[in-house]
């Protein structure tokens, strides 16, 4: 019965999200419905101490990132960078390769350490312009951004600084370059299969006469796109400079990620300036977020300098729109985190995670299935991985020693598995992506789910490759 309660709450949230209802309202309703069926007396304590704590904690940490990311994306659009870069890339790779261009743009940003939430805000203006230029249906944008930002650069490519690749290092005493060949092969599988799928969807839409805005827009881009954006100078230098803010965001983020902890080697003690009530701040936990925020501020300033007249002409409307988008996206994602927190606290969840973890004898398969299942249930790659490793890491270490499996292989498998079924309809990144693009689950989730299946299958392909070749 306890398992049925969890599945019922999860199914209800997926259904309401798919039907277009706001998860800000339905995430707590679905979560508390599960608590009500478990023990009615726990409803109010769970709401105050778990749901609201999780939601508020997420917003406290990440709202500045959402806000600056949304403003950066909007300023990029207002300054004409989106139109300029879109035209340049279309000219280089061809209009028919707009999908590949957006995938690679998202991949470069996430691999450079930019948060995938920021990538959604930053890449969407480019995707919108490029898809309009190539007359590719807008409904394919979420799947395209998902392939570039939510898959191989998040957890497969060795060296990626995303949290899904960092968490296993503390459990398996590895580094972020663990199992490089397996990671590279997994990345190639996801990229190749994902591109084949998205291109097949593009060709099918083209054959049926569907354009950017649907079946009534077979001709040129929508009027609000490239023609109405600030028209960039036609000189090659001007086009090249349009890439500078995007590159700066990645480079500055990397720089401050390395050097901020060195500037505060002992953290920051507020009592040293007479503010004892705030205690000591652990810089290691804040440096990653600070780095992104600084990088985005520099990116915004650089973008404004690119064409300050165009930006200031639309500044009020653009800022208001960006702030509104950031509020909606952060509240949506925070509500989903609160839902995951309540589900993870229910008695049925512990039975479920324990049951899954004891189903498979092979430690790699066991770890992959457990992690991806928990990521799917909680709607969070890092959340599912954290729960799996906190409960099972010692058992996994003993098992891989018994099977003579290097810990680096387990690291890569667990990392990739966390990014498997995490992108179900209630996932925060999915909800943010759809909110930013102005699309619904009904319009675009099919393609996101196809990418979800591809990246989940890639984990087991990597396990098979290791089992057959022993390659690490």
From Swiss-Prot:
It is a multi-pass membrane protein. InterPro entries: Glcn_transporter. Signal peptide: none annotated. Keywords: Cell membrane, Membrane, Transmembrane, Transmembrane helix, Transport. It is found in: Cell membrane. Residues 220-229 have a biased composition (Low complexity). One of its GO terms (cellular component) is plasma membrane. The chain crosses the membrane at residues 4-24, 27-47, 56-76, 99-119, 140-160, 176-196, 240-260, 286-306, 323-343, 372-392, 448-468. Belongs to the CitM (TC 2.A.11) transporter family. This is Uncharacterized transporter YxjC.
């Amino acid at each position: 019965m306890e398992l049925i309660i969890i599945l019922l709450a999860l199914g209800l949230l997926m259904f309401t999200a798919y039907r277009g209802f706001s998860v800000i309202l339905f995430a707590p309703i679905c979560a508390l419905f599960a608590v009500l069926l478990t023990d009615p007396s726990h409803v109010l304590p769970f709401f105050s101490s778990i749901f609201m704590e999780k939601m508020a904690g997420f917003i406290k940490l990440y709202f500045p990132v959402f806000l600056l990311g949304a403003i950066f994306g909007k300023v990029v659009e207002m300054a004409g960078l989106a139109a300029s870069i879109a035209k340049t890339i279309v000219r280089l790779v061809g209009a028919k390769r707009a999908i590949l261009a957006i995938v690679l743009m998202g991949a470069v940003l996430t691999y450079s350490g930019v948060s995938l939430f920021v990538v959604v805000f930053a890449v969407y203006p480019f995707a919108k312009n490029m898809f309009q230029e190539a007359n590719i249906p807008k409904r394919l944008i979420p799947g395209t951004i998902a392939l570039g930002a939510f898959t191989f650069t998040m957890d497969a490519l060795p060296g990626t600084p995303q949290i899904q690749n960092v968490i296993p290092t503390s459990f398996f005493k590895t580094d972020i370059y663990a199992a490089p060949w397996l990671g590279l092969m997994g990345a190639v599988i996801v990229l190749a299969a994902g591109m084949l799928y998205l291109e097949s969807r593009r060709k099918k839409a083209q054959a049926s006469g569907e354009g950017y805005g649907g079946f009534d827009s077979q001709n040129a881009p929508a009027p609000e796109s490239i023609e109405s954006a600030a028209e960039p100078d036609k000189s090659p230098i001007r086009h090249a400079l349009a890439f500078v803010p995007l590159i700066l965001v990645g480079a500055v983020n990397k720089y401050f990620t390395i050097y901020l902890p060195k500037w505060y080697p002992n953290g920051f003690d507020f009592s040293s300036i007479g503010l004892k009530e705030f205690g000591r701040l652990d810089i290691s936990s804040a440096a990653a977020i600070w780095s992104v925020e600084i990088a985005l501020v520099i990116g915004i300033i650089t973008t404004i300098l690119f064409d300050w007249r165009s930006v200031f002409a639309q500044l009020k409307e653009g800022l208001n729109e960006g702030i509104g988008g950031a509020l909606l996206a952060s509240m949506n994602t925070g509500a989903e985190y609160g839902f995951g927190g309540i589900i993870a606290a229910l008695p049925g969840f512990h039975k479920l995670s324990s049951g899954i973890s004891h189903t498979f004898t092979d430690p790699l398969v066991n770890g992959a299935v457990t992690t991806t299942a928990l990521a799917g249930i909680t709607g969070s790659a890092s959340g599912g991985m954290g729960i799996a490793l906190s409960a099972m890491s010692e058992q996994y270490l003993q098992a891989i020693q018994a099977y003579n499996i290097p810990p680096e292989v387990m690291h890569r498998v667990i990392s990739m598995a966390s990014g498997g079924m995490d992108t179900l309809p209630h996932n925060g990144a999915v909800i943010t992506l759809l909110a930013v693009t102005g699309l619904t689950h009904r319009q675009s989730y099919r393609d996101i789910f196809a990418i979800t299946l591809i990246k989940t299958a890639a984990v087991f392909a990597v396990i098979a490759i290791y089992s057959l070749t022993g390659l690490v």
